[in-house]
C-alpha cells in the first residue's frame, strides 16, 4: 500500500481576477508543499472563477485560463500532484474541466458530465456535458493529451473525478469509477451555500467514498465570489464511509487547506494515464485527518448561526471586491435595517477573531486614508454610517431604537429631518394639480413621497463616503411589492432580500438574548423587537402596521413557499392552508383564507416590475425571488384572475 497525503483547498476567487486567482492558487500549492501534501484538489473553475457567466462565451477568457495554467501555474507543481479547474473549448464546444498536473507535467483533462441547471445555476447556457466513458485528444503546449472521462495513475494510485454536480445526480460517475478500481476520487466543486446544505454534501461524500471503497476529496470555493452566491468553503475528506477531515466554514482567509493522510492500494489499470510521483510504502491502513469544525456547527440554532456568518462574509467580500470604503445605511429603527446594521458589526467581529485587527485592516486598506482604527468597535464606526431620516409621521420609539442600535455596535449615527423636502414636493404637485393633496384621495402617493424623499440624502452620503449603500428590503416584502421603488429599495446591494420577515424577527430575538457562538448578544435590540413592524408613512393616529396592510407575515411566507417555491395554483394553496396548523392557530375561516390567497397572488403578479429592479441580493436558500438568477415571472400577466375567481 502507498501512504498518500491528500488536501482539499477552499479558495476565495473572483471571476476574471486573473492575478488574484493565480496568487491564491499558488498560495494553496505552497501551503500544500509545506505540509508535504502529495495530491491537492482545487475548486471548480478556480483559474477563471466559477461565476464568469456569459464571459465563458469569450474566447479570450478560455485562452487566458489555459495560458495561465501552462505558463504561470504548472511550473510550481514539482513534487506534487494538483487538480486545477478551468473552462476548455474543444471542437467548438466549451467544457467545465479539471486539469491533472503531476510533478510539473500536465497529464490530461477531465470534463464535467452533469451540468447544474437548476436554481441559480445556468451551466448548460455556457457548457456542454461530456458523455460518460468517452475520451478524445487535445493539443496543449505541443503535446497531445487525453480529454474527457479520464482517470490517472499517480505513483501507482488510481485517481478519478466527480466535478460538483456529478456527485448530486442519481447515476453518479463514482459508480463507474468503482468498476475501474479507482482508489481516490477528487471532487472540485463550486457549491453555493444554502441553509442545511453542509449535511447534504457530507452525505454525498460519505456515499462516494463507500461506492469506491477508498478516499474521496471535496474542495470548494469560499466567500462572495461574484456578487450573489455565497460559498461557505466546505472542504472534506472521507475514507470508506467515514469523514476523516473537515475544514472550517465561512473563513475570512483567501486560502484554507484541509488535509488527511491515507493508505491506498497500488492498482493496475490499462486505461488510466500513468505518471510518476514518489510515495512512501506503508503496511498499515492508517488514516490521519484533522477536523476544524467549530462549536457553532453543532448548535441547536444552526440556521441562525449560518445566517449570521454567511451574510457577514458576503458583505465583507462585496465591500472589498467592489472597492467600496464601507457602508451607508438608512437606519429606520425597524427590524430590517437593524438586521443589516448588526450584520456589519458581526462581519467585523468574525473577521477580527480569525485574522486579527491588523489582518483585517490590511485586507481593507483601501478604506482608510489615515490611521487605522484601534478597536473593532471603532472600526465599525469607520466603516458604517447610519442615518435616521425623520418626518412628521416618525415616532420617538423608532428614533430611539435606531440611535441605540447604532451606538451599541459603534456605527456613526446621523439624523436628518426630511419633512421640509417632502412638504416641498407636495406643494409642487399640489400647484400642478391645483388642489390640496389628502390622505383620503392620495394615500399611496403621500406614503411613497416620504420614502422617496429620503433617497437623495442617503445616496449623497454614500457618494461622499465612497461607500456602498445598503438596501433593506426582505423577501416577504419583495414577494408582494410592499416597498417604495426608488425609496427604501435604494442601494447597491440588498443583503436580506433573500430571507423572509418571520425568520428575520426570530433571528433578531436570538441575537438580543443569545448571539453567535463565541460572541455577545446585543441587548439594545429589545427596542426593535418590542415593536410591531411598521412603515411609519401614514399619520401616527392611524397606527399603521405592515401586517394590517398585508396579512400576518407567517401566513404570507407560507403562501409564498407554496405558490412560488412549490409552484402551486391558488386552489392547491387553499387546500393546503385549510389543513395547516398555522391557519388553525389564527382561527381563520375559509373567507379569510381566500382573501389572503387573493391578496398574495394579486400583489405578486402586479409587482414583478419591482423585483426586476431590486438591487442584487444574497442567496441563502431555495426560495429566492431574484428574477435574474432564480425565479422568473412575466412582468405583464393575467394575474391569476381565472384561478382566483374559481376560489369563490
Give the location of each predicted region.
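Enzyme catalytic cores with a strong preference for nitrogen-chemistry domains
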Residues: 1-330, 341-368, 408, 413
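ATP/NTP-dependent adenylation/nucleotidyl-transfer catalytic domains that generate, transfer
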Residues: 2-5, 153-155, 213-214, 225-226, ...
